[in-house]
Amino acid sequence: MTAVTSQSAESLARKGYSVAITVASKPRERAKMSTAEVISKDETKVVQLAEELLKKCPPSKTSVVDFLGAQYDMGLAWVHFPVGLGGLGISPKFQKAVNEVLYPAGAPNPMYRNPIGHGMCGPTVAEWGSDAQKKRYLRPLFTGEEIWCQLFSEPGSGSDFAGLSSKGTKDGEEWIANGQKVWTTLAHLSRFGLLVVRTDPEAVKHAGLTAFVVDMQAPGVEVRPLRQMTGEAEFNEVYFTDVRISEAEMLGSPGDGWRVSLTTLMNERVSIGGSMPQRGSGSIASAVNAWKALSPDQQDSATRDELMKLWIRAEVLRLTNIRANTTRKMGTPGPEGSIGKMAGADLNKETYAFAVNLQGANGMLYGSYAMTRPETAMAFDGVQKAFLRSRANTIEGGTTEVMKNILGERVLGLPGDVRVDREIAWNKVARN
């Protein structure tokens, strides 16, 4: 017997799960409970649900899609989302309790199947989408049946995202999109994309943007690979030529594109730089393994000291990310997520460089630079590839220079850069 809220009981019962209503699910009685009692009830509830999910859908005997679908239906996808939309309507901090039950048991991690969708687009659709959009998109996004991409950066507006020039023109009940996006991760696999275009060129640049969900298989959408120094092409450039988008696919209202994109970007920076791996995992694990592979006479004190400095930085970053994730899981991702993104990018580059250097001449050997189209953006395929791939960490998801501006202005309260185009209509701003 599993304890759930009264709202979710009916929907779970229809799917064959045994349910009961807890005293804590009754608003009046819940209001009388102490904070500690509510937390205890909620954590017990999600742990019980997670354990029941493992019993009904053993990861070793259940397909990834079926398991994640059942996880979504039980409200364990994003626990803070509403009932019926992958959540239980409780505090997002209890997602950690769910993950701590599921992942050690071998449950699939949705981030590996659909990193952009799960970490960035899903929260944006949940925040800004219509009821119909939430019901249509969130479940297959979580299961990975429909991969998503983020269509923000352009050749002339990467760091200056608000200056983008792709156009959206209204035509009856549709909008027609034209323009080019670049550095679009996994666009070649994506079924849908989160697209921001300029719909009012006479407004100031931040005010004239509108966001849409776009069908990546629609006529007029062309995806071209961008080959990276690893030999792969996980990034793409995407061209839109008279692509028709229903007005029903708008996120928010016309002109809300900047605010919609901030939701995405705040989640992106926590998603990229604010993950909470176990102590000693990630890039620092590669450095430790490279150290262990050395012969005793090569394990000198200077190299050990360098490794320990990297370890300490990795641990400081891990603890900082825990704090940033706590803020996000309370429903308020903020600019502090830029700390993890910036520090993590620099640390990855230095740590993988250290690991490669320890291998000596073998560190220069790389299997193949053959052009490939990866099935995920998160696969690890050796230290050499990780070293090459880490070069992009200080660029993707916002450059380190942009992160420093965000931290200086929004966290430290320092004066902002002089922006002469802040109050000028976009179509009046001089361009090269």
Regions found by a protein language model. Give the residues of each.
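Glycine-rich beta->alpha junctions and the first turn(s) of the following alpha-helix
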Residues: 37, 221-320, 393, 427-432
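Glycine-rich phosphate/pyrophosphate-binding beta-alpha loops
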Residues: 182-187, 229-230, 392-397
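A short, Trp-centered hydrophobic/proline-enriched beta-strand micro-motif
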Residues: 144-152, 196
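C-terminal helix-coil-helix/basic helical segment that borders enzyme active sites and/or dimer interfaces
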Residues: 62, 301-304, 315-375
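A short core secondary-structure module
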Residues: 173-174, 178-224
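A glycine-biased, small/acidic residue-tolerant capping/turn segment at secondary-structure junctions
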Residues: 72, 352-387, 397-406, 417-423
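Amphipathic, small/basic residue-rich leader segments at the start of a protein or domain
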Residues: 2-117, 126, 132-136, 140-143, ...
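A structural signal for short hydrophobic beta-strand segments in well-ordered beta-sheet cores
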Residues: 166-169
